[in-house]
Amino acid sequence: MATYFVGDIQGCNDELQQLLALAQFNPQHDELWLTGDLVARGPKSLDVLRFVYGLGDRATTVLGNHDLNLLAVDAGYSQAKKKDKTENILTAPDRHELMTWLRTQPIMAEHPTLPVMMTHAGLSPQWDLATARHCAREVEMLLRSDQGNWLLGHMYGEEPSHWDARLTGLPRWRYIINSFTRMRFCRNDGSLEFKCKEAPSDKPALLAPWFEVRQAAPDEPHLVFGHWAALMGKCPLPTIKALDTGCVWGNQLTLWRWDDNAMFSLNCPAYASGGE
């Protein structure tokens, strides 16, 4: 059995299937971990959802910002954007089944036997691992509760940008969601900044990538994340793996096999523009 991790797919199902074939992924025996943003901007988001859902316990995915937005649209709290190309999900006969499944996915996942964990955007520099775990479980439970629709309708916004353990209610939950699904850069004080989406080489002087600010404990598991296509898979820290390489932007879809550290990439020239 092998364990694979794949970056943001964003509806690029044909490319996903080609990449899995290239790596000789076997759904009968292997595990597939996905960094979130299964949907939006690519042409076959419905096919991606059906494929991952059909893998059952052979697949583990985390929620990304585009996945959460789709859930908000499904719940009637947001309008579908034409550029997201998710209209056929909303009219599919298995819409309810797929959306119910998607809503139950975690925003932070840890492998039960391997020293590796996964989120969509990373881990806040203002959290230790115990805090991150607690915050993830808190929001996951809320999304699955009777308050889930309300949260999906009110999660949008960039404040607060600074963590405080005394935060309660919507400000607390918004910070948690933003940290797990939207974060890229931080200011000098560790607060989150959401405007800049460039590569670190093009950032303003007062910003730093979250992974350069966060002080991880020596015994923390490896961390896999996606979301930040401008990184093109480049992260200087050996225990952090960046896997979003901008498939939907016309760049690449990238797959990493944990067992032997093998990397597999597929060029995706069919897409000239894509998602966040």
From Swiss-Prot:
One Pfam family it belongs to: Metallophos
Keyword Hydrolase applies: yes
EC number(s) per entry: 3.6.1.41
Catalyzed reactions per annotation: P(1),P(4)-bis(5'-adenosyl) tetraphosphate + H2O = 2 ADP + 2 H(+)
UniProt-listed Gene3D superfamilies: 3.60.21.10
Recorded GO MF terms: bis(5'-nucleosyl)-tetraphosphatase (symmetrical) activity
Keywords: Hydrolase
UniProt key word Cytoplasm: no
Function text: Hydrolyzes diadenosine 5',5'''-P1,P4-tetraphosphate to yield ADP.
Family: Belongs to the Ap4A hydrolase family.
Entries under PANTHER family matching the protein: CYTOCHROME C5, PTHR40942
Protein name: Bis(5'-nucleosyl)-tetraphosphatase, symmetrical
Organism: Tolumonas auensis (strain DSM 9187 / NBRC 110442 / TA 4)
Gene field: apaH
